[in-house]
Amino acid sequence: MRTKIAMMIAMVVLVALVGGGTALAQTIGGVIQCQSFPCVATGDHQVLFERVGDGVRDRLIAQAGHDHLNARTYTNDRDVAKGSGGHDLLMVNDGDAMDGAIGGPGNDTCIVDAAIEAADTCETVVYR
């Protein structure tokens, strides 16, 4: 009987660890679909996507790590992508030229629609 109880406890712990690892990966690394304003990375190498919908302004903020901030899917809005430590990729080329890409202390690349969207803190600027 004790062996069965010990096996059940071990299975519960194993399931909790496996399931918890997936939830942890969604918040501390990998891809984040933003749901809030502002949307802030957690400090790992991450890809942040702007909130869903045209006309929805976003503020994506990188943390330490080499982050990719993607605010180029939806248009007719004023998005801001702000880099932090690390080599960040800030993409605000959504076709409306109303956005802002602000590099941080790392070596950041800003992809924009027009020169006015790129701050002088972007080490590399690409126009698309």
What are these regions (language model features)?
Residues 26-32:
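Cleaved targeting-peptide boundary
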Residues 100-101:
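Short Cys/His-rich zinc-binding micro-motifs
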Residues 1-9:
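Bacterial N-terminal signal peptides that target proteins for export
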Residues 8-18:
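Bacterial N-terminal signal peptides
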Residues 36, 43-45, 52-56, 64-66, ...:
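Extracellular, beta-strand-rich repeat scaffolds characterized by small/acidic residue-biased motifs
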Residues 21-25:
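Sec/Tat signal peptide C-region and signal peptidase I cleavage site
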